[in-house]
Amino acid sequence: MWKALSLTLALCLLVGCSAESETEGARCKLPPEWKVGDVEPMKNALGQVTVVAYLQASULFCLEQASKLNDLLLKLENQGYPNIAYMVVNNREERSQRLHHLLQERLLNITLYAQDLSQPDAWQAVNAEKDDILVYDRCGRLTYHLSLPYTILSHPHVEEAIKHTYCDRICGECSLESSAQLEECKKATEEVNKPVEEEPRQDHGHHEHGHHEHQGEAERHRHGHHHPHHHHHHHRGQQQVDVDQQVLSQVDFGQVAVETPMMKRPUAKHSRUKVQYSUQQGADSPVASUCUHURQLFGGEGNGRVAGLUHCDEPLPASUPUQGLKEQDNHIKETUQURPAPPAEUELSQPTUVUPAGDATUGURKK
């Protein structure tokens, strides 16, 4: 019996003993065929490094990811990595199809596919989940299948995966790869690695020490993404929020890995509009305000809050026109950050909502 158990354990270690063995087995292989109508996106992209993001239009985090994907495209082109095909495949569930335009508005030079419901699910075909990003070489072979938290585009993992695929022939030689493309890659690498002339600086022992610490940290971070597909335990946060002035019920905020690194992004810093109060002279209470459209990806360390949510410790003032939704505990979900209620001497100034010019998505309502 122990002999059989040992053999089973050994086999588990060999194949990974997890759902990730399917992803590993797909590496350097052509993807299963999937279509959107009569279009075969992967065949059309042959000859280019291809990046496919699986996003959901009803997910606020996904919309932010879509915007950052545009930024990544421009960044890589400026660094000398052209001719990369980027595409996004929307989820086929009803809410995502209905809000397809929200995703489209955030993708400038990137093709967005709305699935044909009469055809097989394109996500299932490649074993993709929401927020996954897959990278393919010029011959259409899978080089990276990245999942949260490694697909957060403010982190370097996706960018590095694209660069490695572009330059390193991860799956061997490719007949669709030209010498000119490899020369482009060489130039881009040389440009990135070009030494930067340092300005003269005073020598301080503790500064030297700090520099080495940061260098070591960067080195650890650079090597930390070679196995980005482990940790697929997800937590789905579902709340009612206002997206583009359309109230959605039970919007899925995305999968958050249990071991996700915490990122502290204060709500006030990322607020998009504020309610202003004018106080009579002599008022000794602080001015109250409510900040809308908080863009906090994760809560404070160890608090277990769901991605995409912003919480307050005080109840929202009744006079605040922010579109936050209260729970019974008076916490505000996603769109608002609270301040203490305004003193009696304060009145709402006009206009009550200060939004960026031309911003139709501002969540404040005018009285």
From Swiss-Prot:
It comes from the Eukaryota. It holds the Pfam family SelP_C. Residues 191-220, 326-336 have a biased composition (Basic and acidic residues). Residues 221-237 have a biased composition (Basic residues). InterPro entries: Selenoprotein-P_N, SelP_C, SeP. The keyword Magnesium does not apply. Keywords: Glycoprotein, Secreted, Selenium, Selenocysteine, Signal. Might be responsible for some of the extracellular antioxidant defense properties of selenium or might be involved in the transport of selenium. This is Selenoprotein Pa.
